[in-house]
Curated annotation (Swiss-Prot):
Gene name per UniProt: uvrB
Motif Beta-hairpin, chain ranges: 92-115
Superkingdom to which the source organism belongs: Bacteria
Classification via Gene3D superfamilies: P-loop containing nucleotide triphosphate hydrolases, UVR domain
Segments forming domain UVR: 629-664
Protein name (database record): UvrABC system protein B
Domain Helicase C-terminal: 431-597
SUBUNIT field: Forms a heterotetramer with UvrA during the search for lesions. Interacts with UvrC in an incision complex.
Record carries keyword DNA repair: yes
Length: 669
């Protein structure tokens, strides 16, 4: 029997959770294709879904609207299911400039990208888990609707090794090269292998913990062992092991040869069309580029931009949807769309933007028409591929409500008894000075403040103004990358600063119980950022705190403001009635602060290295000035010793601790 989900939690479902779990579970068992969970901020929507997954025991994909929320959900699901496979699948690009052509200035922009190795490994781990086991939860961003390698080709390319298997060393090395692994006898890293006599060490592309040692004797696999790639220490022996390809885009040799023939036929057809229209430059361009790609595919089995030939490599017909992560999800899988009011429109918009750019490339001879099939799913294709779906939002959109026939599962009462924030409207004229006084009240109580503005310029000016008045403030904007954004939110929770200013980045799903005040500047300016849905979501950021409050600065109450305030008061009234009926006293949340992906930074701003965690400054908070000085000297000696031994990560870790102790010394003595 396949492994089942085992939910770990110190809490039992409370508030509206038991009823929501029952309704969602019954709906799925009855075969309902679409259900909507209207869950207010802090009502434990993730815990509700975790219970449904555990009860039904079905592989699940959770779609989030961005990497930050996906990282938060991944962290929470890992806490709930430590014994099961919880995976993370988002775009692995830290930076991505797609191939593009600007006809007006005759400018061709080459594709340029920076790949995050850690996220690439997590993506490979996600598809491996879906292929190997049933107890899988994959937390994904909208990256899940983009083309991925064909699962059939991916499965065919695997290298299966078992003890006692008859295979010579040269055959294993040839197969590893086909899987796009490279030989590197000096630097042993992910996606490489090394050879020492009759021993082959392979560092699997999807692993960050184990490497495989294959010991051969007379063309027979004598022993398979998993070992620590850093220390070389063997951890345990295994009877069999499957080596997965280094990339999702790997293709069997026979399929590549078939694809090359089809590409040649299309090239000839395209050349005729371009010549017939007098496009000599475009004809020369497409011929040169395609012939170079064909040469590379023939010699190496792949080429730069091979995804543009995905129609032929996956054996699909023109216009057919590309293979995506949905093709790896079993037929009885479950789809959970988090913050659906944002995620669903995103899915619909991806195809159109991609298509417009590629049509220009095709028209001017940079790509052949088949490149148009290297694309994200169209919305109707997504609908056809999606299994049974639960939409989750505090403010469900029109689409979700229609799909679930207006029958919504409500989760308004929180297990903690916390009420929705009090909402107050104040005049715009004094908004900045009024905000400053409110921030100071919160800072004294060690509480945090979120401020949302309408423009980037105003956010920058406000941040500068607050800094000049001695407030500890940071500004969250769209230029900040995913990892740094996670770290800023973590630093806010840790109390590194008190105020976070942003524009449209503080709305959905950011889980910060320390935030007791949300200030919405210029709330009476109707528009996308001040719509009913946006206001409800932003107000909800203060709903995880016992003293939660939202201040809307506006000179008039717009329709959106009236609806948002009315809905917040409706929910607050329902929560109060439930609390009084059941004798519940609201309790603040005490949520632990995790390093969401284990790729963030600890407070203090420096990344942790491998090895043991160092003690924090709090460990030495009771030391006298003399003892503290002695401790700093001791740690400095330790730091220099690590550096002398070339253990730079440990040295950096101790350096951070020394810095924290020095700050403590200055503050206290």
């Amino acid at each position: 029997m396949s492994k089942v989900f085992k939910l770990h939690s110190d809490f039992q479902p409370g508030g509206d959770q038991p009823e929501a779990i029952r309704q969602l579970q019954e709906g799925l068992e009855d075969g309902l294709a679409h259900q909507t969970l209207l869950g207010v901020t802090g009502s434990g929507k993730t815990f509700t879904v975790a219970n449904v997954i555990a009860n039904l025991n079905r592989p699940t994909m959770v779609l989030a609207p961005n990497k930050t929320l996906a990282a938060q959900l991944y962290s929470e699901m890992k806490d709930f299911f430590p014994e099961n496979s919880v995976e993370y699948f988002v775009s692995y690009y830290d930076y991505y400039q797609p191939e593009a052509y600007v006809p007006s200035s005759d400018t061709f922009i080459e594709k340029d990208a920076s790949v995050n190795e850690h996220i690439e490994q997590m993506r490979l781990s996600a598809t491996k888990a879906l292929l190997e086991r049933r107890d899988v939860i994959v937390v994904a961003s909208v990256s899940a609707i983009y083309g991925l390698g064909d699962p059939d080709s991916y499965l065919k390319m695997m290298l299966h090794l078992t003890n006692g298997m008859m295979i010579d060393q040269r055959s294993i090395l040839r197969r590893l090269a086909e899987l796009q692994y490279t030989r590197n006898d000096q630097a042993f890293q992910r996606g490489t292998f090394r050879v020492r006599g009759e021993v082959i060490d392979i560092f699997p592309a999807e692993s960050d913990e184990h490497a495989l040692r294959v010991e051969l004797f007379d063309d027979e696999v004598e022993r398979l062992s998993l070992f620590d790639p850093l220390t070389g220490q063997v951890q345990y022996h295994v009877p069999r092991y499957t080596v997965y390809p280094k990339t999702h885009y790997v293709t069997p040799r026979e399929r590549i040869i078939q694809a090359m023939e089809a590409i040649k036929i299309e090239l000839e057809q395209r050349r005729k069309v371009l010549l017939a229209n007098g496009k000599l430059l475009e004809e020369q361009r497409i011929t040169q580029r395609t012939q170079f790609d064909l040469e590379m595919m023939n010699e190496l089995g792949y080429c730069s931009g091979i995804e543009n030939y995905s129609r032929y490599l996956s054996g699909r017909t023109e216009g057919e949807p590309p293979p995506t992560l949905f093709d790896y999800l079993p037929a009885d899988g479950l789809l959970v769309v988090d913050e659906s009011h944002v995620t669903i429109p995103q899915i619909g918009g991806m195809y159109r933007g991609d298509r417009s750019r590629k049509e220009t490339l095709v028209e001017y001879g940079f790509r052949m028409p088949s490149a148009l099939d290297n694309r994200p799913l169209r919305f109707e294709e997504f609908e056809a591929l999606a299994p049974q779906t639960i939409y989750i939002s505090a403010t469900p959109g029109k689409y979700e409500l229609e799909k679930s026939s207006g029958d919504v599962v409500e989760q308004v009462v929180r297990p903690t008894g916390l009420l929705d924030p009090e909402v107050e409207v104040r005049p715009v004229a004094t908004q900045v000075d009024d905000l400053l006084s409110e921030i100071r009240i919160r800072a004294v109580k060690n509480e945090r403040v979120l401020v949302t503005t309408l423009t980037k310029r105003m956010a920058e000016d406000l941040t500068e103004y607050l800094e000049e008045h001695g407030e500890r403030v940071r500004y969250l904007h769209s230029d900040i990358d995913t990892v740094e954004r996670v770290e800023i939110i973590r630093d806010l929770r840790l109390g590194e600063f008190d105020v976070l200013v942003g524009i449209n980045l503080l709305r959905e799903g950011l889980d910060m119980p320390e935030v007791s005040l949300v200030a919405i500047l210029d709330a009476d300016k109707e528009g996308f950022l001040r719509s009913e849905r946006s206001l409800i979501q932003t107000i909800g950021r203060a709903a995880r705190n016992l003293h939660g409050k939202a201040i809307l600065y506006g000179d008039k109450i717009t329709d959106s403001m009236a609806k948002a305030i009315g809905e917040t008061e409706r929910r607050r009234a329902k929560q109060q009635i439930f609390n009084e009926k059941h004798g519940i006293v609201p309790k603040g949340l005490n949520k632990k602060i995790n390093d969401i992906l284990q790729i963030g930074q600890p407070a203090g701003g420096k990344r942790k290295g491998r090895g043991k965690a160092v003690a924090t400054a709090e460990t030495f908070s009771n030391l006298s000035a003399k003892e503290l000085e002695s401790k700093i000297r001791e740690l400095e000696a330790k730091m220099y010793q690590h550096a002398q031994d070339l253990e730079f990560e440990q040295a950096a870790s101790v350096r951070d601790q020394v810095q924290a102790l020095r700050e403590q010394f200055i503050a206290n003595f």
